[in-house]
Amino acid sequence: MNKENVITLDNPVKRGEQVIEQVTLMKPSAGTLRGVSLAAVANSEVDALIKVLPRMTAPMLTEQEVAALELPDLVALAGKVVGFLVAELGAVTFPKNLSVDDLMADVAVIFHWPPSELYPMSLTELITWREKALRRSGNTNE
């Protein structure tokens, strides 16, 4: 795993006898970001981070542990999450109401793919397939 994706927590997470001092972030896939707005993740909204960080951290933090993080630790983790999005998509502005679920639904409806085919896709792949789905459906206004 890339050492750049490792965050040393200023205030370690205590889980019973275990003390988590470092957290490794994994590059998110479409499945990782399901159920949240891309704009919310890109803007580091706390509710979105509480949802996605447990899906992309090792050791896996719980939603309760993420919610209890000290601000400097949450900001450090959020910076890595946003870094993944910027590296993957560039300077893309997401409409407030656009979610990964919306992208997946557009692709699934047109191409009849099950979610299991879509979850492993990167955001770039998912957006590319959504554009193809919109063109195929004749809806190019989005």
UniProtKB/Swiss-Prot annotation:
Keyword vocabulary terms for this entry: Late protein, Viral release from host cell, Viral tail assembly
InterPro entries: P2_GpE, Phage_tail_E/E
UniProt key word Transmembrane helix: no
Record Pfam families: Phage_P2_GpE, Phage_TAC_7
Highest rank taxon of the organism: Viruses
GO biological process: viral tail assembly; viral translational frameshifting
Task of the protein: Promotes tail assembly by creating a scaffold for the tail tube proteins. Tail assembly proteins E and E' would wrap the linear tape measure protein to create a tail assembly scaffold.
Protein family membership: Belongs to the mulikevirus tail assembly protein family.
The protein's name in its UniProt record: Tail assembly protein E'
Record organism: Escherichia phage P2 (Bacteriophage P2)
Phylogenetic lineage: Viruses, Duplodnaviria, Heunggongvirae, Uroviricota, Caudoviricetes
Encoding gene, per UniProt annotation: E'
